[in-house]
């Protein structure tokens, strides 16, 4: 099912950018989990448009409505349905895109696959689809906190050629949220913001890298072959709009090391097995080893830009397109909570699978 994710904690998203609403159905949520609308809304507010001058100015409150699966402040164990109504729609800004394909966008490939597409804001390919992921991820993050004290933190480490210095400490939520770019290094964040503003003034866009760290994951989560933990994390991240790369631990840089340099030596600390280094990124053989999980996701520059570009129309003629509408000059600030949400969805699903198979890590 191409619109669903997860095996036991299953998430199905629905809706389009300029349709009536977008939302999600969560199947497999444990019963009796205390849950409020406010907990979901807090995460949605972090991804909503219009929150700063370096993101799209589209004004959406993104107020979530829980339609089913919640009774007297607790989950019932039945499908939990959440919906957000679309409000600030301007389909006239996309009129030209009915006939012309945006370069590097999903316009052409959706047309090639389905023979029909909703050209208004990209329809189903719009990042508004991720509202459902963030709503579901808020629930998954709460389960992980209650079950094992697992903490997930994503943050921007690179915008174009501007990179943060190596960070050794696990950043706090306050450090990440201190600036609109969601980079925990203040000086680098300021340079990133200036770059985005400069590029936006030129009608252009930029990409970058988000790093995600997870602490508190016990050893044993994941599967040994096709459903390796890093494979599922990679699939989750690469399913996000605008992603073009994923690496975990040492990633591609690890290819420059020798085995004697890359191996993570085991030691006993406080009665448990741990490692002195973490080139593996917290996963070995597809299974978590108890160390901090560390991975990075590459996001391309936003495809929809205001500069004239060479393209083709639906009749097969060469033409030119200068996009209109309201678009992010850089998707990374709003992608941070989405990366955290998808991480939580992967981990809670593997947590439940491990509990079902081995009777451990119970909620």
Curated annotation (Swiss-Prot):
Q: Which Pfam families match?
A: Chorismate_synt
**Which residues take part in binding NADP(+)?**
47
Key words, A-Z: Amino-acid biosynthesis, Aromatic amino acid biosynthesis, FAD, Flavoprotein, FMN, Lyase, NADP
Paired cysteines (S-S): none
Q: Which cofactor does it need?
A: FMNH2
- The residue ranges crossing the membrane are none
Q: Which domain of life is it from?
A: Bacteria
- The residues that the entry says bind FMN are 124-126, 285, 300-304, 326
User: A GO molecular-function term, please?
Assistant: FMN binding
Its UniProt pathway annotation is:
Metabolic intermediate biosynthesis; chorismate biosynthesis; chorismate from D-erythrose 4-phosphate and phosphoenolpyruvate: step 7/7
What's its catalytic activity? 5-O-(1-carboxyvinyl)-3-phosphoshikimate = chorismate + phosphate
Q: What class of enzyme is it?
A: lyase
Q: How is the cofactor bound?
A: Reduced FMN (FMNH(2)).
EC number(s) stated in the UniProt entry for this protein? 4.2.3.5
GO CC aspect terms: cytosol
> What is a biological process (GO) this protein takes part in?
chorismate biosynthetic process
Q: InterPro entries, per this entry?
A: Chorismate_synth, Chorismate_synth_AroC_sf, Chorismate_synthase_CS
List the NCBIfam families hit by this protein, alphabetically.
aroC (TIGR00033), PRK05382.1 (NF003793)
Belongs to which family? Belongs to the chorismate synthase family.
What do we know about how this protein assembles, alone or with others? Homotetramer.
Function, as annotated: This reaction introduces a second double bond into the aromatic ring system.
Please identify the protein, giving its name as recorded: Chorismate synthase
């Amino acid at each position: 099912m191409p619109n669903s994710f997860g095996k036991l904690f299953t998430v199905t998203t629905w809706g389009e950018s300029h349709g009536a609403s977008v939302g999600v159905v969560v199947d497999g949520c444990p019963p009796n989990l205390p849950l409020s609308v406010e907990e979901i809304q807090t995460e949605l507010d972090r991804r909503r448009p219009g929150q700063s001058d370096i993101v799209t100015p589209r004004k959406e409150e993104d107020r979530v409505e829980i339609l089913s699966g919640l009774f007297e402040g607790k989950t019932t164990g039945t499908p939990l349905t959440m919906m957000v109504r679309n409000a600030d729609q301007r389909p006239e800004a996309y009129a030209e895109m009915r006939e012309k394909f945006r370069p590097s966008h999903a316009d052409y490939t959706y047309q090639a696959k389905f023979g029909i597409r909703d050209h208004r804001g990209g329809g189903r390919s719009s990042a508004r689809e991720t509202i459902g992921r963030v709503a579901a991820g808020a629930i998954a993050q709460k389960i992980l906190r209650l079950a094992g004290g697992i903490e997930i933190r994503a943050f921007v480490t690179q915008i174009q050629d501007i990179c943060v210095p190596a960070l050794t400490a696990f950043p706090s939520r306050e450090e990440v949220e201190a600036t609109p770019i969601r980079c925990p290094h203040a000086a680098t964040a300021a340079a990133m913001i200036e770059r985005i503003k400069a590029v936006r003034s030129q009608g252009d866009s930029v990409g970058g890298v988000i790093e995600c760290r997870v602490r508190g994951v016990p050893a044993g989560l994941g599967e040994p072959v096709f459903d390796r933990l890093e494979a599922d994390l990679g699939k989750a991240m690469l399913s996000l709009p605008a992603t073009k790369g994923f690496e975990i631990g040492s990633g591609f840089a690890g290819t420059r090391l020798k085995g004697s340099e890359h191996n993570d030596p085991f030691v006993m600390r406080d009665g448990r097995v741990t490692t002195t280094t973490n080139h593996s990124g917290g996963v070995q053989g597809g299974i978590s080893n108890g160390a901090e999980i560390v991975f990075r996701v590459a996001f391309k520059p936003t495809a929809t830009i205001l500069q004239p570009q060479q393209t083709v129309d639906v009749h097969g003629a060469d033409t030119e397109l200068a996009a209109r509408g309201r678009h992010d000059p850089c998707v990374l600030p709003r992608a941070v909570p989405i990366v955290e949400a998808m991480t939580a969805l992967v981990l809670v699903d593997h947590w439940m699978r491990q509990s079902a198979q081995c009777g451990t890590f119970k909620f």
